[in-house]
Amino acid sequence: MAKKSKIAKNEQRKEVVARFAERRNELKAIIKNPNTSDEDRLDAQFELNRQPRDASPVRVRNRDSRDGRPRGFLRKFGVSRVRMREMAHRGELPGVRKSSW
């Protein structure tokens, strides 16, 4: 089980990312557009740099939805590899079963 503070911090980061996502995308589009003037591009870069560090989506960590484990995360199931194995053995994941050949 991950520390409650780490899980809470990650949830807070998700909220900050969602709050700044639209403006962040607008600024990045201005910066990438080749027809933008140098002055506008520079202003957009400055505004992007003034945004909070946690507004960047790369700072959000994928965590197990059950216990917050940060490693071994499987996107398809939204849980860690350990939890996925336990759930599969209990038959809680439809269509998933232990393979044998």
UniProtKB/Swiss-Prot annotation:
Annotated gene: rpsN
Protein name in the entry: Small ribosomal subunit protein uS14
Any single biological process term in GO: translation
UniProt subunit comment: Part of the 30S ribosomal subunit. Contacts proteins S3 and S10.
Bilayer-spanning residue ranges: none
Compositional bias annotation for Basic and acidic residues: 61-70
UniProt keyword terms in alphabetical order: Ribonucleoprotein, Ribosomal protein, RNA-binding, rRNA-binding
Record function comment: Binds 16S rRNA, required for the assembly of 30S particles and may also be responsible for determining the conformation of the 16S rRNA at the A site.
GO cellular component, one term: small ribosomal subunit
